[in-house]
Amino acid sequence: MTAPTVPVALVTGAAKRLGRSIAEGLHAEGYAVCLHYHRSAAEANALSATLNARRPNSAITVQADLSNVATAPVSGADGSAPVTLFTRCAELVAACYTHWGRCDVLVNNASSFYPTPLLRNDEDGHEPCVGDREAMETATADLFGSNAIAPYFLIKAFAHRFAGTPAKHRGTNYSIINMVDAMTNQPLLGYTIYTMAKGALEGLTRSAALELAPLQIRVNGVGPGLSVLVDDMPPAVWEGHRSKVPLYQRDSSAAEVSDVVIFLCSSKAKYITGTCVKVDGGYSLTRA
C-alpha cells in the first residue's frame, strides 16, 4: 500500500462523459482517482493510462455492476457464488484503501437511464407476457440499483471506512457528491422508475448529510439538465430541447457540470452540505 499522502477520489461511471470529466478535473486538482466502470473497460483503462502518464500511481480502474442483482460479477470473482450489491460497493471503497490507504471523496455518478412506461401492451393490446414482466423487474433492479441503492451502499461503506481510520491517517476534507437530476420534479414522460430513483437519491443526499455531519463528511448533490447529449436522438428533437433553455439556449458541457462537482469537493465549500445544485441553465424553471 502506498503511503497516504494525497487525497483520493472514487468516481463511479468514470470511463466516459460526465464521469470522465469529473475524474479528470479531480485529478488535475491533485487527487488520485479510482475509476469505476461497468462495461467500458477500454475507455477506463485508456483514461487510467493517460492520468498515470501525467502523474505516476495516480489512477486505478475497478469493474463492478451496480445494478441491484445478486449474481452480477465483480473484478476478481470466479462467478461460482452470487455477489451482492452491498459487497460490490464495499469492495469499490476497499480498493482505494488497498491501493492508497484512504478515500476522501466519493462521487456517485454511475446511472442507468432509459424509459419504463407504465402502460406498455403488446401489439394485440394484451398485458405483457411473463418475459416482459421479468424484463421490467430487471430494469427496476438496474435503474434503482445504479441510481439509488448503490449510492446508499457506497456512502455506507465510505463512512464506515472513515470511522475505522486512525485520526493521524485521516485527511481534512471529506466530501460525497451524488449526481442527481435537475428535472426530477418535471419528469420526462415514460421514465417513471428513473424519476423515482433520482428522487430517492435526492432524499439520500439530505439524510446522509444530516447523519454524517458530526463526522465532518459533507454530502451534496449536483443536478445536470441537458448535458452531454446522446447521439441517437434526432437532431430536431434535441434542438427543440435546447431552444427551451433560458440561459444560452444550449446544453451544458461536461466541464460546466464537473466544475461544480470539483468546487463542492473543495475546501472552499466546507460549509455546504445537504444541498442539490442544479446546473441546467434554468431549464427546470420552464418545463411543465
From Swiss-Prot:
Chain residues that bind NADP(+): 17-40
Keywords: Methotrexate resistance, NADP, Oxidoreductase
Gene Ontology BP terms: response to methotrexate; tetrahydrobiopterin biosynthetic process
PROSITE patterns: ADH_SHORT (PS00061)
GO molecular function: 6,7-dihydropteridine reductase activity; oxidoreductase activity; pteridine reductase activity
Catalytic reaction(s) noted: (6R)-L-erythro-5,6,7,8-tetrahydrobiopterin + 2 NADP(+) = L-erythro-biopterin + 2 NADPH + 2 H(+)
The protein's enzyme class: oxidoreductase
Protein's pathway: Cofactor biosynthesis; tetrahydrobiopterin biosynthesis; tetrahydrobiopterin from biopterin: step 1/1
GO cellular component: cytosol
Stored SUPFAM superfamilies: NAD(P)-binding Rossmann-fold domains (SSF51735)
EC number: 1.5.1.33
Active-site residues, record numbering mapped to chain: Y194
Highest taxon of source: Eukaryota
Residues binding substrate, per UniProt: S175
Pfam families according to UniProt: adh_short_C2
The keyword Nuclease belongs to this UniProt entry's keyword annotation: no
General function of this protein: Exhibits a NADPH-dependent biopterin reductase activity. Has good activity with folate and significant activity with dihydrofolate and dihydrobiopterin, but not with quinonoid dihydrobiopterin. Confers resistance to methotrexate (MTX).
PANTHER family: OXIDOREDUCTASE, SHORT-CHAIN DEHYDROGENASE/REDUCTASE FAMILY (AFU_ORTHOLOGUE AFUA_5G02870), SHORT-CHAIN DEHYDROGENASE_REDUCTASE FAMILY PROTEIN
Assigned protein family: Belongs to the short-chain dehydrogenases/reductases (SDR) family.
Assembly information from the UniProt record: Homotetramer.
Protein name as catalogued: Pteridine reductase 1
Taxonomic classification: Eukaryota, Discoba, Euglenozoa, Kinetoplastea, Metakinetoplastina
